[in-house]
């Protein structure tokens, strides 16, 4: 009874928050008159995912004037998950959106618990055209539910002008190891006072990037067994992170906004992140021509390491019991799985790295980008994506990472990595069994 009461109370709270004037949610609409007559989409990031959905709405309505109106709502990633899970658990289907974006780290948890609530798209989407690691992420129990969107391919983006002040050239930034990256970073900081990158103690994407570049994750390939204590790639990632801190190569930030403002304001010399960060880098047009992109550094002394990885990335999912599931499936598959002209538009306007194996079908594939000194950024990132190791993210990435963050902070004070990883292993095993 108590659980039921709590669930009802939570539902009321969420529904009230969704309509409250002070909500964090920002709604933009393509000529929406009635919510009930609109295809409703929830996504995050106005410069990337939500912008892509709005552009898709514009293109689709031009081709299909009689199609339903399309409403795009910007919410935070966590907010989308919590709201949708609560609505599904309570079967309040009339409040559901038709389409949601889910980050690749989260999707297995969602599909394990709510598989029957999503539209399987095997007969609508040609999944063979997507890179293997992205295709596998949208599968569950032999069916495919998502339309892969951005790759999340990791890359090293750097300010050539800042590095040149320290005596380094574009050639010096090719085929880096992590030790060489840190050597360059030390000299850059000594000569310019600019740290090499941002580090956020409350978020560990860099650890994920390094770990996956070695073909490992927080869980084994079965997606369930916690793989912490004997995970050499994780240990190496944490050692690299620690060394970056000890050598003062990282600027401490807290959260997304500080991360973005640091490189937009020229406070760091490089960014190691996913290709989706391109749209944020290019927001500051005064820096056009100053940026370059290259492969991530290679982890030394690990025979499985490659200079390629992934961070984040997402796909579109259609809710089966929403008001307009069928027409939403028509819209999403046409725009995001079939229309190569529209994908060209996204490459040009938001800098997406599509999840396609073969980008030569896109006219914009070899386009050069003056912002990056004439580099063919899409082609480069696609070449990186082709060798990203495939790992099983499982369904507990963020839960295990929360444990790791807490214990790693203690390790930085106590200096005992073995003890740290042992504690994380024990706690992660408990989480993995839930």
Predicted region positions:
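Short, low-complexity disordered leader/linker segments with a strong preference
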Residues: 1-40, 62, 426-434
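Mature extracytoplasmic/periplasmic domains
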Residues: 33, 52, 116, 277-279, ...
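Extracytoplasmic/periplasmic substrate-recognition and gating elements
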Residues: 62, 66-71, 89, 166, ...
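Extracytoplasmic "Venus flytrap"/periplasmic binding protein-like
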Residues: 65-132, 165-167, 269-270
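A structural signal for short loop-to-beta-strand junctions that line the ligand-binding cleft
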Residues: 86-89, 95-98, 122-163, 184, ...
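Hinge/lid segment of periplasmic solute-binding proteins
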Residues: 101-155, 180-184, 209-214, 292-296, ...
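Extracytoplasmic/periplasmic solute-binding protein
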Residues: 145-149, 154, 179-226, 233, ...
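Glycine-centered hinge/linker elements that transmit conformational signals in sensory
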Residues: 182-187, 223-253, 296
């Amino acid at each position: 009874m108590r659980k039921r009461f709590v669930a009802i109370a939570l539902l009321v709270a969420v529904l009230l928050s969704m309509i409250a004037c002070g909500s964090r949610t920002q709604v933009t609409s393509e000529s929406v008159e009635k919510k009930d007559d609109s295809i409703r989409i929830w996504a995050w990031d106005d410069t990337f995912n939500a912008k892509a959905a709005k552009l898709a709405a514009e293109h689709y309505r031009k081709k299909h004037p009689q199609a339903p109106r399309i409403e795009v709502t910007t919410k935070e990633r966590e907010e989308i998950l919590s709201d949708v899970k609560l609505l599904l658990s309570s079967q309040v289907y009339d409040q559901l959106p038709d389409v949601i974006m889910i980050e690749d780290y989260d999707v297995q948890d969602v599909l394990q618990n709510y598989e029957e609530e999503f539209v399987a798209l095997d007969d609508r989407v040609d999944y063979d055209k997507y890179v293997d690691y992205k295709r596998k992420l949208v599968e569950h129990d032999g069916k495919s539910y998502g339309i892969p969107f951005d790759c999340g391919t990791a890359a090293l983006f750097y300010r050539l002008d800042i590095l040149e002040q320290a005596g380094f050239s574009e050639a010096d930034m090719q085929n880096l190891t992590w030790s060489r990256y840190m050597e360059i970073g030390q000299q850059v900081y000594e000569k310019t006072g600019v740290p090499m990158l941002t580090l956020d103690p409350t978020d560990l994407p860099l650890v994920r990037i390094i770990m996956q570049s070695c073909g490992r994750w927080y869980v084994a390939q079965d997606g369930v067994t916690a793989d912490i204590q004997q995970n050499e790639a994780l240990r190496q990632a944490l050692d690299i992170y620690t060394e970056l801190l000890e050598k003062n190569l990282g600027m401490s930030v807290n959260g997304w906004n500080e991360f973005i403002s640091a490189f937009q304001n020229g406070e760091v010399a490089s960014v190691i992140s996913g290709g989706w960060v391109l749209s944020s880098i290019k927001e500051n047009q005064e820096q056009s021509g100053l940026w370059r992109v290259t492969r991530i550094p290679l982890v030394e002394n690990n025979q499985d390491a490659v200079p390629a990885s992934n961070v984040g990335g997402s796909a579109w999912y259609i809710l089966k019991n929403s008001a307009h599931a069928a027409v939403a499936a028509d819209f999403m598959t046409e725009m995001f799985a079939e229309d190569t002209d529209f994908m060209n538009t996204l490459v040009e306007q938001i800098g997406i790295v599509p999840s396609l194996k073969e980008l030569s079908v896109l006219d914009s594939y070899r386009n050069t980008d003056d912002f990056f000194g004439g580099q063919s950024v899409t082609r480069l990132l696609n070449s990186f994506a082709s060798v990203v190791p495939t790992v099983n993210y499982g369904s507990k990435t963020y839960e295990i990472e929360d444990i790791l963050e807490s214990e790693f902070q203690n390790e930085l004070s106590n200096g005992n990595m073995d003890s740290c990883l042992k504690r994380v292993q024990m706690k992660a095993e408990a989480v993995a069994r839930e």
